[in-house]
Regions:
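Nucleotide/pyrophosphate-binding catalytic subdomain
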Residues: 1-252, 337, 342-347
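A conserved active-site cap/scaffold subdomain adjacent to cofactor or substrate pockets
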Residues: 235-283
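A conserved regulatory-domain signal marking ACT and ACT-like small-molecule sensing domains
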Residues: 278-363
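Short gly/pro-enriched beta-turn/loop segments at secondary-structure junctions
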Residues: 205, 262-264, 296-299
Length: 363
């Protein structure tokens, strides 16, 4: 959600739904990074954060003027302006002018980074004339191993309670942000957590489907930035999707798959800007392609196939063919539908185009 055009596309997509929908929104594109940058500037006693804050405010106000109906703009501007110029500015000013203890800084950082979703959800709620819901009221985390992790059972119960009974035509809530179950402090589900929030809600409610609208057509057989001829994967099993995400595909935040897999919720990944493109359906049925896709992360490459593929034979063939190009790979992990290979003498991303070509030949 980075522009007026994308938000108007969201409005059109929601308007074509024939049953009640819950819309889970992320921050406007780039805003989370700006919030983090302003926090660090303020901690460094650098007043340059004020210029970025003004840019953030201007951008939100400009979007309001283009997407929110005229009769609701004043209310939306008042909320967004108060939140930015009072709440957000006040926290940044406190960090800039005071020596704040480290534990409080961490709490404030989590609060500041949550503002992006709160602001965008206010705009989308007003744009759609929807019913708002505050996600931290039902998305809960707990401390484990020094980190904030989802309190899954509590979250599931609270979602059922929050959304029990008849639903309004359109509900809007925030992705990513949460509250600690014990302290009620601001926390979050990690970058990419908006997909995860949507999956948790869909799973808890037994939704008809989960639709993840993004800026690509769906899952592709490789990263199109390095393999321009990468093809759209029309269908994936939950396990195949998990392996692609775990192997480096960034289309969907990796933890998103587990809740919908466990509850058997069909999940579509589609392009906001090209809604007529079929997209990728993630469900019980696996892709019919012998070789589904290849992804890379750090120094590893993961190849995802059908379950009935001979992975050992495929891995041996890939290693033999690539060794003739001076590229050495060793197998390091395997699932029923994937094999992960470690690259010993270079970066995995540079190997992906060649491997993709070899895999297509293998078919």
């Amino acid at each position: 959600m980075g522009s007026v055009d994308s938000l108007l596309k969201v409005k059109d997509i929601v308007g074509h739904q024939n049953e009640p929908v819950i819309v889970v929104v992320s921050a406007l594109g780039g805003v989370t990074n700006q919030l983090l940058a302003m926090t660090e500037q303020a901690l460094s006693k650098d007043s340059a954060y004020e210029a970025t804050l003004a840019l953030v405010a201007d951008r939100h106000m400009d979007i309001i003027s283009h997407v929110v109906p005229a009769d609701r703009q004043a209310e939306c501007r008042e909320f967004v302006g108060e939140f930015i110029n009072s709440s957000l500015a006040g926290m940044l000013r406190m960090l800039c002018l005071n020596d704040v203890p480290a534990d409080i800084v961490e709490d404030m950082r989590k609060s500041i980074v949550s503002f992006g979703e709160i602001l965008s959800s206010a705009i989308v709620t007003m744009m759609l004339d929807a019913t708002p819901r505050f996600a931290p009221g039902f998305i809960k985390t707990k401390r484990s191993g020094g980190e904030d992790v989802l309190d899954a059972e509590l979250t599931r119960r609270l979602i059922k309670s929050e959304f029990g009974g008849s639903q309004p035509p359109t509900t809007v809530t925030q992705g990513f942000i949460a509250h600690d179950a014990a302290t009620d402090k601001d926390t979050n589900l990690g970058r990419g957590g908006s997909d995860y929030t949507a999956a948790l809600i869909a799973a808890a409610l037994g939704a008809t489907a989960l639709e993840i609208w993004t800026d690509v057509d769906g899952f592709l057989s490789a990263d199109p930035r390095v393999v321009p001829e990468a093809r759209l994967i029309s269908k994936l099993s939950f396990a195949q999707a998990e392996d692609l995400c775990n192997g480096g595909a960034k289309v969907v935040y990796y933890p998103t798959i587990a809740p919908v897999r466990d509850s058997r919720i069909p999940t579509w990944v589609k392009n906001t800007f090209r809604p007529d493109v079929t997209g990728t359906l993630i469900g019980d049925e696996m892709s019919t392609e012998a070789v589904v896709g290849v992804t890379s992360k750090d120094d590893t490459v993961t190849v995802v196939t059908r379950v009935d593929a001979d992975l050992a034979l495929l891995a041996d063939e890939l290693m033999r063919r690539l060794m003739s190009e001076g590229i050495v790979l060793i197998p390091v992990a395997r699932t029923p539908q994937s094999v992960t290979l470690r690259l010993l003498n270079g970066q995995a991303a540079t190997v992906v185009p060649l491997m993709h070509k070899l895999l297509l030949e293998h078919e």
